[in-house]
């Protein structure tokens, strides 16, 4: 399971022109689910994402988590993250989880986040338009 996290001052996701999820200060989480992923990996990744220190303290050091700053999380499914890009000019998607399992684990991950922080989400498998203001920019690739 892969989470590409971005520290944002705001982010939103739209489907067919309608905002389906939006946050102010917090993390945009692009989530990729791989074939071998399970609930244990999702839980570990939620713990890392919500505790990862990406926000600045009073001295300007990244010592605070999204929980520490009272931020929110916007979780968006991103099936391209597990893609194999090592050869050629076209990505291979065989490492990604089957759609039904990916959706189940995406929902599980999002639900766990919502138990910890205000959480918004995109719509699984929809054609989404994501807008954000990346604060920094600060972006990290986390895996479970």
From Swiss-Prot:
<dbReference type="GO" id="GO:0019478">
    <property type="term" value="P:D-amino acid catabolic process"/>
</dbReference>
<dbReference type="GO" id="GO:0005737">
    <property type="term" value="C:cytoplasm"/>
</dbReference>
<feature type="short sequence motif" description="Gly-cisPro motif, important for rejection of L-amino acids">
    <location>
        <begin position="136"/>
        <end position="137"/>
    </location>
</feature>
<comment type="subunit">
    <text>Homodimer.</text>
</comment>
<comment type="similarity">
    <text>Belongs to the DTD family.</text>
</comment>
<dbReference type="GO" id="GO:0000049">
    <property type="term" value="F:tRNA binding"/>
</dbReference>
<keyword id="KW-0963">Cytoplasm</keyword>
<dbReference type="GO" id="GO:0106026">
    <property type="term" value="F:Gly-tRNA(Ala) deacylase activity"/>
</dbReference>
<dbReference type="GO" id="GO:0051500">
    <property type="term" value="F:D-tyrosyl-tRNA(Tyr) deacylase activity"/>
</dbReference>
<dbReference type="InterPro" id="IPR003732">
    <property type="entry name" value="Daa-tRNA_deacyls_DTD"/>
</dbReference>
<dbReference type="InterPro" id="IPR023509">
    <property type="entry name" value="DTD-like_sf"/>
</dbReference>
<keyword id="KW-0694">RNA-binding</keyword>
<comment type="function">
    <text>An aminoacyl-tRNA editing enzyme that deacylates mischarged D-aminoacyl-tRNAs. Also deacylates mischarged glycyl-tRNA(Ala), protecting cells against glycine mischarging by AlaRS. Acts via tRNA-based rather than protein-based catalysis; rejects L-amino acids rather than detecting D-amino acids in the active site. By recycling D-aminoacyl-tRNA to D-amino acids and free tRNA molecules, this enzyme counteracts the toxicity associated with the formation of D-aminoacyl-tRNA entities in vivo and helps enforce protein L-homochirality.</text>
</comment>
<protein>
    <recommendedName>
        <fullName>D-aminoacyl-tRNA deacylase</fullName>
        <ecNumber>3.1.1.96</ecNumber>
    </recommendedName>
</protein>
<dbReference type="GO" id="GO:0043908">
    <property type="term" value="F:Ser(Gly)-tRNA(Ala) hydrolase activity"/>
</dbReference>
<keyword id="KW-0820">tRNA-binding</keyword>
<keyword id="KW-0378">Hydrolase</keyword>
<dbReference type="GO" id="GO:0006399">
    <property type="term" value="P:tRNA metabolic process"/>
</dbReference>
<dbReference type="Pfam" id="PF02580">
    <property type="entry name" value="Tyr_Deacylase"/>
</dbReference>
């Amino acid at each position: 399971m892969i989470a590409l996290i971005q520290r944002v001052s705001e982010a939103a996701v739209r489907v067919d022109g309608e905002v389906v999820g939006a946050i102010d200060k917090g993390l945009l989480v692009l989530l990729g689910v791989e074939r071998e992923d399970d609930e244990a990996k999702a839980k570990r990744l939620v713990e890392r994402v919500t505790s990862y220190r990406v926000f600045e303290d009073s001295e300007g050091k990244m010592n605070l988590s999204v929980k520490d700053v009272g931020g929110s999380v916007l979780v968006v499914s991103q099936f391209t993250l597990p893609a194999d890009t090592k050869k050629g000019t076209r990505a291979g998607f065989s490492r990604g989880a089957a759609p039904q399992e990916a959706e189940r684990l995406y929902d599980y991950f999002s639900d766990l986040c919502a138990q910890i922080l205000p959480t918004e989400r995109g719509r699984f498998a929809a054609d989404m338009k994501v807008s954000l203001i990346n604060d920094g920019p600060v972006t990290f690739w986390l895996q479970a």
